[in-house]
Amino acid sequence: MTEEMLYAALLSFGLIFVGWGLGVLLLKIQGAEKE
């Protein structure tokens, strides 16, 4: 793998991880408000 491919893979994985983290955080906030 070239450096560019590795960087692209890390970037895409990072975006997915950040998006998942934000989704979980929002669900926790909404759940706390409902209770």
UniProtKB/Swiss-Prot annotation:
Pfam name, any one: PetM
Subcellular localization: Cellular thylakoid membrane
Keywords recorded for this protein, A-Z: Electron transport, Membrane, Photosynthesis, Thylakoid, Transmembrane, Transmembrane helix, Transport
Membrane topology: Single-pass membrane protein
Main location (coarse class): membrane
Annotated TM spans: 6-26
Domain of life: Bacteria
GO terms under cellular component: cytochrome b6f complex; plasma membrane-derived thylakoid membrane
InterPro entries attached to this UniProt entry: PetM_cyt_b6/f_cplx_su7
Biological processes annotated in GO: photosynthesis
Gene Ontology molecular functions: electron transfer activity
Family: Belongs to the PetM family.
Quaternary data: The 4 large subunits of the cytochrome b6-f complex are cytochrome b6, subunit IV (17 kDa polypeptide, PetD), cytochrome f and the Rieske protein, while the 4 small subunits are PetG, PetL, PetM and PetN. The complex functions as a dimer.
Biological role stated in the UniProt entry: Component of the cytochrome b6-f complex, which mediates electron transfer between photosystem II (PSII) and photosystem I (PSI), cyclic electron flow around PSI, and state transitions.
Protein name as catalogued: Cytochrome b6-f complex subunit 7
Organism: Mastigocladus laminosus
Lineage, uppermost ranks: Bacteria, Bacillati, Cyanobacteriota, Cyanophyceae, Nostocales
